[in-house]
UniProtKB/Swiss-Prot annotation:
Pfam annotation, one family: Cpn60_TCP1
Listed GO biological process terms: protein folding
Native source species: Caenorhabditis elegans
Record family assignment: Belongs to the TCP-1 chaperonin family.
GO cellular component: chaperonin-containing T-complex
Key words of the record: ATP-binding, Chaperone, Cytoplasm, Nucleotide-binding
An example Gene Ontology molecular-function term: ATP-dependent protein folding chaperone
Function: Molecular chaperone; assists the folding of proteins upon ATP hydrolysis. Known to play a role, in vitro, in the folding of actin and tubulin.
Domain of life: Eukaryota
InterPro entries (alphabetical): Chap_CCT_zeta (IPR012722), Chaperone_TCP-1 (IPR017998), Chaperonin_TCP-1_CS (IPR002194), Cpn60/GroEL/TCP-1 (IPR002423), GroEL-like_apical_dom_sf (IPR027409), GROEL-like_equatorial_sf (IPR027413), TCP-1-like_intermed_sf (IPR027410)
Subunit structure, interactors included: Heterooligomeric complex of about 850 to 900 kDa that forms two stacked rings, 12 to 16 nm in diameter.
Descriptive protein name: T-complex protein 1 subunit zeta
Cellular location(s): Cytoplasm
Gene name for this UniProt entry: cct-6
């Protein structure tokens, strides 16, 4: 009897070979699920929730988040792979495949009697050599629009069909370039993703400004304003109760009317200060007739205040979302104010066009033609919910791919070129490695081929035949020329315009190696939680 079973007779235990088999079966099971999703030729998965909601996706991160995984090892791999997506924005499926293949290659060695510690030493040596090659293999290049388009297109074509991916690529790259400031990393939170159930997915577009998901709340307000001054504020323009419990008493009806009038006057004075600012910048200017005035307030505006603003031709929006207030300020300029006591023309932003768009019962307000917007909106359109969700997930990955390229200032040849180069290099260098760790290093090199092998199978080609072609071409080409897989012909090609992120590849290989080594060194799996200690209650 094991020590844990002495302490807890109800504990479940798997030791040595059984523990290793448990870990490897979990990793390979998850690998088999994810394998067919890899690359631009990958297939889709249909996820059906308990409520009947349907989601079509080939994004590994979405799959791992949505699937209910019970196996402890598979669950651990899923969490590690989704963490990879959280940090770098991509590489989830590749990480799962690499972990599964590392454990698969190690299984045969361990079953032949090689200690798992020796295997992990070989893995760690090969991982170090691979990351050294990555630093030499990457292409440092000036961050220009053409390069960013190629990187983003490579990422999006693995998530969407080719025509849609090429269309959205332009929008994503222009969005990041619009918010980018010299010498600083772009803040991707300044790219708003607005959904609109309308038209086709090819109508997804970039708005160089902001789109708000609500409209004016007064029928007499203008719905189309050109050359608009915009006041961004967080001021209550409605009667609010006091924060503490308080009461006001009156003796007669006249006193009650006076009380109500005083409350109304307090709000009206605030509205008049906004109207005075409007008159100052528009009515008193020579070309004021051709200009408009817009108020966007984070707090509420009551009907009497809306009446006053509408009578002056002011378009007012109330209860704007907090997350949009900073974006609005960066898009139109000016300063967001918390009080109307000291309003000046310098507080105002400007937009060339503000208009309301109605779609069924929903209303949207577009703020466009901003002078130098530092915040933009990607307007995601689609005929149904699952199409919009699929595009939104892909845009997230595209934004991160562009961001990583700007930060890294380098890219990596794609189409599995790095994995082929690393395999050829490791097979050559492993000859200089002494001892049994050489077997682990060879297994690591073999595991790297899971990426080109899977890409070939998903493209409809024979895996072994394709691998032989690629390895022969790479060996003949030499270390300085990248050789990748051409999914149109199934042959070898030097990748042109197909780039991977350096950060994504580095994190994927590192995290896969660490997790595979940890799982190989597990010699006991114990299920001994408190739930197992509870005794059944007698009836």
């Amino acid at each position: 009897m094991s020590s844990i079973q002495c302490l807890n007779p109800k504990a479940e235990l798997a030791r040595h070979a059984a523990a290793l088999e448990l870990n490897i079966s979990g990793a390979r099971g998850l690998q088999d699920v994810m394998r067919s999703n890899l690359g631009p030729k990958g297939t889709l998965k249909m996820l059906v929730s308990g409520a009947g909601d349907i989601k079509l996706t080939k994004d590994g991160n979405v799959l791992l988040h949505e699937m209910a995984i019970q196996h402890p090892t598979a669950s651990m791999i899923a969490k590690a792979s989704t963490a990879q997506d959280d940090v770098t924005g991509d590489g989830t499926t590749s990480t799962v495949l690499l972990i599964g293949e590392l454990l698969k290659q190690a299984e045969s060695l361990v079953l032949e009697g090689l200690h798992p510690r020796i295997v992990t030493e070989g893995f760690e040596w090969a991982n170090t050599k691979t990351l050294e090659l990555l630093e030499k293999f990457k292409k440092e290049a000036p961050v220009e629009r053409d390069l960013l388009v190629e990187v983003c297109r490579t990422a999006l074509r693995t998530k969407l069909h080719q025509k849609l991916a090429d269309h959205i690529t332009e929008c994503v790259v222009d969005a990041v370039l619009a918010i980018r400031r010299d010498g600083e990393e772009p803040d991707l939170h300044m790219v708003e993703k607005m959904e609109m159930h309308h038209d086709s997915d090819m109508d997804t577009t970039l708005v160089r400004g902001l789109v708000l998901d609500h409209g004016a709340r007064h029928p007499d307000m203008p719905r189309h304003v050109k050359d608009a001054y915009i006041l961004t504020c967080n001021v209550s323009l409605e009667y609010e109760k006091t924060e503490v419990n308080s009461g006001l008493f009156y003796k007669t009806a006249k006193e009650r009317e006076a009380l109500l009038a005083a409350e109304r006057e307090f709000i009206t004075r605030r509205v008049h200060k906004i109207i005075e600012l409007k008159k100052k910048v528009i009515d008193n200017s020579p070309d004021g007739k051709n200009k408009g005035f817009v108020v966007i307030n984070q707090k509420g505006i009551d009907p009497p205040s809306l009446d006053l603003l509408a009578s002056e031709g002011i378009l007012a929006l109330r209860r704007a979302k907090r997350r949009n207030m900073e974006r609005l300020q960066l898009a139109v300029g000016g300063e967001a104010v918390n009080s109307v006591d000291d309003l000046t023309p310098e507080d105002l932003g400007w937009a060339g066009l503000v208009y309301e768009h109605s779609l069924g019962e929903e209303k949207y307000t577009f703020i466009e033609e901003c002078r130098a917007p530092k915040s933009v909106t990607l307007l995601i359109k689609g005929p149904n919910k699952h199409t919009i969700t699929q595009i939104k997930d892909a845009i997230h990955d595209g934004l991160r791919a562009v961001f990583n390229t700007i930060v890294d200032k380098a890219v990596l040849p794609g189409a599995a070129a790095f994995e082929i180069a690393a395999y050829v290099m490791l097979k050559k260098d492993v000859e200089n490695l002494k001892g049994r760790a050489k077997l682990g290093a060879e297994a690591f090199a073999q595991a790297l081929l899971v990426i080109p092998k899977t890409l070939a199978v998903n493209g409809g080609y024979d895996a072994q035949e394709t691998l032989v072609k690629l390895i022969e071409e790479k060996t003949a080409a030499g270390p300085d020329i990248a050789v990748g897989l051409d999914l149109e012909t199934g042959g070898a090609v030097e990748p042109q315009g197909i780039w991977d992120n350096v950060t994504v590849k580095k994190n994927s290989i590192s995290s896969a190696t660490v997790l595979a080594c940890n799982l190989l060194l597990v010699d006991e799996v114990m299920r001994a939680g408190m739930t197992n200690l509870k005794q059944p209650q007698p009836e």
